[in-house]
């Protein structure tokens, strides 16, 4: 078992991005401070009843896994899932502020043209259009606004897939996480399984923590054969240091390791839209547990102590990452979603209705905790993740 002290940072990645927050936290917070995404006044049309939301995100280093799969198997359609990853990372963030209709999306592909040929680019574009149509079929109005393909071989040895989404919603529909206060139930929605609108089983991995997941699980075979897929300045001890190849079965799962790592990020937008239509403003807050994993909630609300004492059992992909790497529980919950990638905050009397709605989408949901008043002397938010064996404290 290797040293688990901040393994993510040793690969050049920060789960907290504290240095980024140190800068942006002093900038204008927009029309509704406290929302999951920044919301501005309607600068595009000038409508006083509307506002603007614009958001950028992407598939991160998950595209490297698709690249490896393509190089070994020759099937460019593996990039269909990467297209979905990039889109979902934007749309699900927007959904956490109440935006899910009349969204225009643009995509940017930064590639090494030598390693990422035209047939793969075509598959990526095809995957984008296919997923957007699936969303529209589910009642989520998202349209493509085009995109950009940049050949930047000196920047990347493979490919980076990013998206940007913009909408002009009514101010009245915005979900403001500043309404997260003591006395609320926290409802978690499973990231694994197979929802009613997914074509295959989902491992729950999402699009966060993939740098560590890839290196912790995959073997030196990939270090030797794909030097373009990692930073040469990273200590070799932390590069492809796992026991598996992509086609190996994942323990306690129906998926291979590669399938689990490449499992397309589930969108919760149809579910969250349905919940909002049923309980309206009694949906006090929503958090997409992406970067920062289970600690993401700490950035929202004020004077809140988040108690999570009924989490889902971690899906097999997270169990195996921990088993082979020795990563601490503290770091696992900061890097990975650990079983639920969306949580909402509502009064306890609405919990059963929310869980019932989720069941209609075949997504497991349950009350995973509650909010209390912070015990910090300076009013700072706190988080406790409790299990039978230990309590993890953050904040």
Where are these regions (language model features)?
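Helix-biased detector of long, well-ordered alpha-helical tracts
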Residues: 1-395
